[in-house]
Amino acid sequence: MQKQLLIESFLVNARYFTEIKTGVTESANLQNKNVQILRTIQGPMGIINEETANGRIYEEKEILNAIKALESKLKARACLGQLDHPKDEPSLTEVSHLVTELFIKEVNGKKYLYGTWEILNTPAGRILNNLYEAKIAIGTSLRGYGIVDENKKVKDYEL
């Protein structure tokens, strides 16, 4: 079987996000180049080991492998996000946040893929920041490639 593009959407109530840092700060990793981060938040981006709204199951071991494969991109600060659900790679003019960390977290007996986001001081980032401040639910969308087997389980997954 050939890998296919898999897109998962996950609507998250703002109360499930945790604020790590607030206020306009300069990113320490960018050698004082005045790149402004509006705030840093952590929150769930998808459910693990359970069927998603699209009828697929992402097992923990597959997600852990995908995170490991993405480590160099995360360290290079190259995992960009944007508002809405882009059809292609994020457009630099539409970037709202930078994903700096991905990990698995158990909440009330269920496992989730969590991410740490730096909300950027860009037009789209300011919109995302305002949505967060207003406690509006934030939808996340994961894009990856994998093979879906006959049991709806995703195999050989790449974020």
Predicted feature residues:
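Residue microenvironments linked to proteolytic maturation
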Residues: 8, 100-159
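Generic recognition of long tandem-repeat/solenoid scaffolds
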Residues: 36-44, 79-81, 112-118, 154-156
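A structural signal for short, hydrophobic beta-strand segments that form beta-sheets
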Residues: 11-25, 30-32, 90-103, 148, ...
